[in-house]
């Protein structure tokens, strides 16, 4: 019988203390999981926005903008809020499509949150600045250069739901006349 008396186990107090420590750890873990999920979602949305901006820039950099024969399919934005138009006195011929001066270029039109196939919730804008007027572009004053900026916006998630304001990513590229 004395062999049973020498064996010791956990006391009720020790078990309660261990249970309390484990409970605190689970509560802390429960608070971190939503924040980690938000961080993954934010990374996904930011990567998608950058991809969509780069995708549009790839399309734009292949557009014809040549002086002889005159063909301007890159266009110029009249203001920071306007999509590019063919400059007055110029035309754009791209495949079977011809756009006269002063008219909008369909491939550079603003795209709302339902216009980008397979990417609902993202909007995209293209702005083209003439580097030959005013202060130029990033210190470059040259009529043969234009600054193209593609901005992609979306409404991000936060740690507690959907944000109240959209978030935007933009990518810019200088393009020279061919």
PLM features: residue spans?
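Aliphatic-rich helix starts adjacent to a transmembrane/signal segment
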Residues: 10-54
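Low-complexity, Gly/Pro-rich coil/beta segments used as flexible assembly/activation regions
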Residues: 47-178
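N-terminal leader/signal peptides at the extreme start of proteins
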Residues: 1-10
């Amino acid at each position: 019988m004395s062999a049973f008396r020498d064996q010791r186990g956990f006391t009720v107090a020790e078990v309660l203390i261990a249970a309390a420590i484990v409970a605190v750890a689970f509560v802390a873990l429960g608070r971190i999981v939503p924040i980690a999920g938000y961080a993954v979602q934010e990374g996904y949305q930011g990567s998608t926005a950058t991809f969509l901006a780069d995708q549009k820039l790839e399309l734009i950099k292949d557009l014809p903008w040549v002086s002889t024969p005159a063909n301007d399919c890159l266009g110029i934005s009249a203001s920071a809020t306007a999509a590019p138009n063919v400059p007055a006195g110029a035309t754009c011929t791209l495949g079977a499509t011809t756009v006269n001066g002063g008219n909008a270029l369909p491939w550079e039109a603003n795209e709302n949150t339902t216009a980008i196939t397979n990417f609902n919730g993202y909007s995209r804008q293209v702005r083209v600045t003439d580097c030959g007027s005013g202060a130029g572009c990033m210190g470059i004053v040259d009529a043969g250069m234009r600054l193209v900026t593609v901005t992609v916006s979306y409404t991000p998630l936060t740690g507690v739901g959907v944000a109240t304001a959209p978030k935007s990513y933009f990518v810019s590229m200088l393009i020279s006349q061919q």
